[in-house]
């Protein structure tokens, strides 16, 4: 089932807000008719924890990572995150992944930055193959 993002969405870096302020912001977007809130990942809050919190404070707004860094979590963890948020907020979560930027991966995170396309492909294949023993969400 495809997630409906709506006609208008907002990309917002919310790390300057407290969690309750971010929830109020998300609720305002929802009330104003926005379809989606895209949340990036850099060196601040964990976007997935924040999305879980925001989803609990909204009813219809779709949340998407824009983007989450594949170097921050292994494939099994990302699969579990995707399944968990898809269960918590059915039809309201989009997992946007990326390879980030070389300096963030090598200098900030301490990983080797390899060929982006083949690295992403391998990560997605590993996610697909990863073990997940939790209850499957109704929409994924």
Describe these PLM feature segments.
Residues 2, 77-140:
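Internal, glycine-rich beta/alpha segment that forms the wall or movable "lid"
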Residues 38, 62-66, 86, 94-96:
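Short, conserved beta-strand segments within well-ordered enzyme catalytic domains
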Residues 22, 44-47, 71, 78, ...:
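Generic structural signal for well-ordered secondary structure
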Residues 1-63:
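N-terminal beta1-alpha1-beta2 module of alpha/beta enzyme domains
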Residues 19, 37, 68, 110-113:
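Active-site oxyanion-binding pockets that recognize sulfate/phosphate
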Residues 13-15, 42, 68-70, 98-102:
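Active-site beta-loop-alpha junctions enriched in small/polar residues
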Residues 48-68, 72, 119-129:
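Alpha-helix-loop-beta-strand connector modules within alpha/beta enzyme cores
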Residues 17, 72-76, 115:
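Residue-level signal for the nucleotide or nucleotide-sugar donor/cofactor binding architecture
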